[in-house]
A protein has these predicted regions:
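Bacterial N-terminal signal peptides that target proteins for export
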Residues: 1-11
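Bacterial N-terminal signal peptides
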Residues: 10-19
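Bacterial Sec-dependent signal peptides at the C-terminal "C-region" and cleavage site
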Residues: 18-28
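Beta-strand-enriched cores of mature, soluble protein domains
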Residues: 26-188
Length: 188
């Protein structure tokens, strides 16, 4: 009885090691970050102030432009807002949801979460009415947009993941700009 119990335990432990070993084993030579391809840019203007907020805020994004790498252009159409959350002083979680109308009349619904973390220069630049840029007011500013549409022309957008990198935030002038990149998937 003791021998069969020992054998069963040994088989079980060996199986678990084999299974978990295959699940967690990684090949460092092939463990590469995904590649990115420039997709376009996104600019919001007429950003409404999130007045008197202590943590959560809603900032209306009154107008803006989505410019695709192929030259197609879309404009913000309501609704469009950032339902943000101030985590710490000058550290924001972004929760943006917007509708864009393309020149051909197609509608794109863009939504994303992200992080915007300012550096030590941010307050001084804001007091002087100067814009924030990476390494000059912004320490980290990234988001992960998804797009939904019923347009046949833009249907491919339903199946891609974008990464947005903040380029400039000029809150005194009321605009921000992102560069957008498409994540390129590699077949395994």
């Amino acid at each position: 009885m003791k021998i069969s119990s020992f054998v069963l335990k040994s088989v079980f432990v060996s199986s678990m090691i084999f299974c978990f070993g295959n699940i967690t084993a990684a090949d460092p030579k092939n463990n590469k970050a995904p590649k990115l391809e420039y997709f376009g840019s996104l600019t919001y203007r007429d950003i409404g102030e999130g007045k008197n907020f202590s943590r959560n805020f809603v900032a209306n994004l009154g107008s803006g432009t989505l410019t695709l790498a192929n030259g197609d252009i879309g404009k913000v159409s309501a609704p469009c807002a950032d339902f943000g959350n101030a985590q710490k002083e000058l550290w924001f979680d972004l929760d943006v949801r917007c509708t864009f109308t393309m020149e051909d009349g197609a509608h794109l619904y863009i939504f994303y979460g992200g992080k915007m973390i300012m550096d030590d220069k941010a307050k001084e630049l804001m007091d002087e009415g100067k814009p924030w840029k990476p390494k000059n007011g912004i320490k980290y500013w990234i988001n992960a947009p998804l797009i939904r549409t019923s347009s046949q022309k833009y249907d491919y957008m339903n199946y891609i993941q974008l990464i947005g990198k903040g380029i400039i935030a000029d809150l005194s002038a009321g605009y921000v700009t992102y560069d957008l990149y498409k994540v390129l998937y590699q077949k395994l």
